[in-house]
Regions:
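Extended alpha-helical targeting/anchoring segments
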Residues: 1-237
Length: 237
């Protein structure tokens, strides 16, 4: 990372999932901001919005930082963790640059707000930030061009993006496929897109696996990062 001047990179791993449930059954019972089933390929129940576009305003909510809600003073512990703070700063700086390519008057509206996610293993706290801007005229109707400009998602690649992608391709042992892509819904007035995380996939033999990822910085400790990946392997019911 230091050699390539990468301040933040998001690495993922694949965990085998043992369950009697089918993808369709997991889809039926899951609860999240977005729950999507794609044939026999995957089910995703993501808590993370990528960008929302309404009235020519674009908003993004990069999510970084996870802790078990059962940890004593969990919110304070997460807020006071220097690595988690620096990770959120890095992704906010990068997403401000990303939004500046397609919008003006970019600003951070909220820095490190909490959301609680319920899982079968217990609740977890996650921190996100909110960044917004006013769409440039050339992107107010051409959302396809906008997404082409902004993808892949910064929160699941890294900063700087090109250098992070090169490292990811070199070190990750499995192909992500649809994992860490986006799902877009446009109703004619509001365009919402979601990051495809919290993701159960099926291979060609029908075996299920769970993708999870986490942000790595020069302050990361391997054991803590590995444990965080485990916390993100869950169902919501």
């Amino acid at each position: 990372m230091a050699k390539d001047h990468v301040g933040l990179i998001n690495l993922c791993m694949k965990t085998g999932l043992q369950t009697d449930l089918s993808l369709a059954e997991i889809y039926r019972y899951s609860k999240a901001k977005l729950v999507v089933l794609y044939d026999r390929h995957f089910v995703c129940f993501t808590p993370e919005i990528f960008v929302e576009i309404e009235n020519d305003t674009i908003t993004t909510h990069p999510m970084k930082g996870t802790i078990g809600a059962d940890v004593p003073n969990a919110r304070e512990v997460l807020l006071n963790d220097p690595k988690e703070h620096d990770e959120q700063v890095a992704i906010c700086q990068w997403m401000q640059q990303e939004l500046s390519a397609v919008s003006d008057d970019v600003k951070i509206d909220k820095f490190r707000y909490f959301t609680k996610v319920k899982t079968v293993k217990g609740d977890i706290w996650q921190t996100s930030s909110q960044i917004s801007g006013r769409l440039k005229p050339e992107y107010r109707r051409d959302f396809g061009d906008l997404f082409e400009k902004m993808l892949p998602v910064g929160s699941i690649s890294g900063a700087p993006k090109a250098e992070s992608e090169a490292i990811i391709k070199d070190v990750e042992r499995c192909k992500r496929g649809f994992y860490s892509g986006i799902f877009v819904h446009f109703d004619g007035k509001v365009c919402r897109s979601y990051v495809l995380i919290r993701f159960v996939g099926s291979d060609e033999n029908g075996a299920l696996h769970y993708f999870s990822g986490g942000g790595i910085t020069n302050q990361s400790e391997a054991k803590k990062e590995y444990d965080e990946l485990g916390k993100k392997v869950y169902l919501t019911f």
